[in-house]
Protein backbone atom coordinates (compact mmCIF):
# COMPACT_ATOMS: atom_id res chain seq x y z
CA UNK A 1 0.00 0.00 0.00
CA UNK A 2 1.39 3.39 -0.98
CA UNK A 3 0.95 6.35 1.35
CA UNK A 4 -1.07 9.24 -0.11
CA UNK A 5 0.25 12.74 -0.74
CA UNK A 6 3.77 14.06 -0.45
CA UNK A 7 5.46 13.20 2.84
CA UNK A 8 8.33 15.11 4.43
CA UNK A 9 10.83 13.90 6.97
CA UNK A 10 11.93 16.80 9.17
CA UNK A 11 15.30 15.88 10.67
CA UNK A 12 18.50 14.09 9.78
CA UNK A 13 19.48 11.95 12.77
CA UNK A 14 19.32 8.20 13.29
CA UNK A 15 15.62 8.20 14.27
CA UNK A 16 14.76 10.33 11.21
CA UNK A 17 16.80 8.02 8.99
CA UNK A 18 14.97 4.94 10.28
CA UNK A 19 11.57 6.56 9.79
CA UNK A 20 12.55 7.80 6.32
CA UNK A 21 13.45 4.25 5.30
CA UNK A 22 10.06 2.95 6.46
CA UNK A 23 8.10 5.79 4.82
CA UNK A 24 10.04 5.53 1.54
CA UNK A 25 9.16 1.82 1.36
CA UNK A 26 5.50 2.88 1.24
CA UNK A 27 5.82 5.98 -0.97
CA UNK A 28 6.83 6.91 -4.50
CA UNK A 29 9.17 9.54 -3.09
CA UNK A 30 9.74 11.72 -0.04
CA UNK A 31 10.90 15.22 0.78
CA UNK A 32 13.61 15.33 3.42
CA UNK A 33 14.69 18.36 5.42
CA UNK A 34 18.18 18.29 6.89
CA UNK A 35 19.78 21.43 8.24
CA UNK A 36 23.30 20.79 6.89
CA UNK A 37 24.05 21.02 3.16
CA UNK A 38 27.32 19.12 3.56
CA UNK A 39 25.44 16.13 5.02
CA UNK A 40 22.91 16.27 2.18
CA UNK A 41 25.66 16.24 -0.46
CA UNK A 42 27.46 13.38 1.25
CA UNK A 43 24.18 11.44 1.58
CA UNK A 44 23.53 11.86 -2.15
CA UNK A 45 27.07 10.76 -3.02
CA UNK A 46 27.14 7.73 -0.72
CA UNK A 47 23.51 6.60 -0.91
CA UNK A 48 23.20 6.52 2.88
CA UNK A 49 23.26 8.88 5.83
CA UNK A 50 26.98 9.58 6.40
CA UNK A 51 26.57 10.04 10.16
CA UNK A 52 23.80 7.64 11.22
CA UNK A 53 22.74 4.09 10.30
CA UNK A 54 25.44 3.98 7.63
CA UNK A 55 24.51 0.44 6.55
CA UNK A 56 20.98 1.50 5.58
CA UNK A 57 20.93 2.27 1.83
CA UNK A 58 18.46 4.58 0.05
CA UNK A 59 17.30 5.06 -3.53
CA UNK A 60 18.50 8.66 -3.77
CA UNK A 61 16.48 9.30 -6.95
CA UNK A 62 13.31 9.04 -4.85
CA UNK A 63 14.37 11.65 -2.27
CA UNK A 64 14.08 15.43 -2.59
CA UNK A 65 16.59 16.78 -0.05
CA UNK A 66 16.76 20.38 1.10
CA UNK A 67 18.21 22.42 3.94
CA UNK A 68 15.43 24.97 3.35
CA UNK A 69 12.71 24.06 5.84
CA UNK A 70 10.17 26.35 4.16
CA UNK A 71 10.72 24.79 0.72
CA UNK A 72 10.15 21.30 2.12
CA UNK A 73 7.01 22.38 4.00
CA UNK A 74 5.54 24.08 0.92
CA UNK A 75 6.13 20.96 -1.19
CA UNK A 76 4.62 18.49 1.31
CA UNK A 77 1.19 17.42 2.53
CA UNK A 78 2.35 15.51 5.62
CA UNK A 79 5.20 16.63 7.88
CA UNK A 80 6.85 14.05 10.11
CA UNK A 81 8.91 15.92 12.69
CA UNK A 82 11.85 13.83 13.86
CA UNK A 83 14.26 16.55 14.98
CA UNK A 84 16.09 16.02 18.26
CA UNK A 85 14.15 17.73 21.05
CA UNK A 86 16.94 20.24 21.87
CA UNK A 87 16.71 21.62 18.29
CA UNK A 88 12.92 21.80 18.01
CA UNK A 89 12.63 25.50 18.83
CA UNK A 90 15.41 26.59 16.47
CA UNK A 91 13.84 24.64 13.59
CA UNK A 92 10.37 26.04 14.25
CA UNK A 93 11.73 29.60 14.41
CA UNK A 94 12.94 29.21 10.80
CA UNK A 95 9.46 28.16 9.70
CA UNK A 96 7.70 30.97 7.82
CA UNK A 97 5.41 28.78 5.72
CA UNK A 98 1.91 28.16 7.08
CA UNK A 99 1.30 24.63 8.28
CA UNK A 100 -2.43 25.02 8.92
CA UNK A 101 -3.45 22.70 6.07
CA UNK A 102 -0.69 20.16 6.66
CA UNK A 103 -1.04 16.84 8.41
CA UNK A 104 1.49 16.89 11.26
CA UNK A 105 3.10 13.83 12.81
CA UNK A 106 5.64 14.08 15.59
CA UNK A 107 8.15 11.38 16.40
CA UNK A 108 10.16 13.71 18.63
CA UNK A 109 11.15 12.34 21.99
CA UNK A 110 12.97 13.92 24.87
CA UNK A 111 13.14 17.15 26.81
CA UNK A 112 13.46 20.68 25.42
CA UNK A 113 16.40 22.16 27.37
CA UNK A 114 15.95 25.34 29.43
CA UNK A 115 12.19 24.81 29.50
CA UNK A 116 11.83 21.29 30.89
CA UNK A 117 9.20 20.55 28.25
CA UNK A 118 8.70 16.87 27.57
CA UNK A 119 7.95 16.04 23.93
What are these regions (language model features)?
Residues 78-81, 85-119:
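Rossmann-like NAD(P)(H) cofactor-binding subdomain of soluble oxidoreductases
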Residues 2-4, 75, 99-100:
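Short helix-loop-beta connector
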Residues 37, 72, 111:
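Residue-level detector of flexible, active-site-proximal loop/helix-junction positions
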Residues 1-56, 63-67:
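NAD(P)+-binding Rossmann beta1-loop-alpha1 motif at the extreme N-terminus of oxidoreductases
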Residues 60-76:
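A structured beta-alpha segment of the ubiquitous adenosine-cofactor-binding alpha/beta core
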Residues 11, 60-61, 83, 111:
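Residues that cap or flank secondary-structure elements
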Amino acid sequence: MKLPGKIAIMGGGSWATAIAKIVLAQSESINWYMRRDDRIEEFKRLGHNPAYLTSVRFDIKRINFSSDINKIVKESDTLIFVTPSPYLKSHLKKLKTKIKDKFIVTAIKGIVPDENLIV
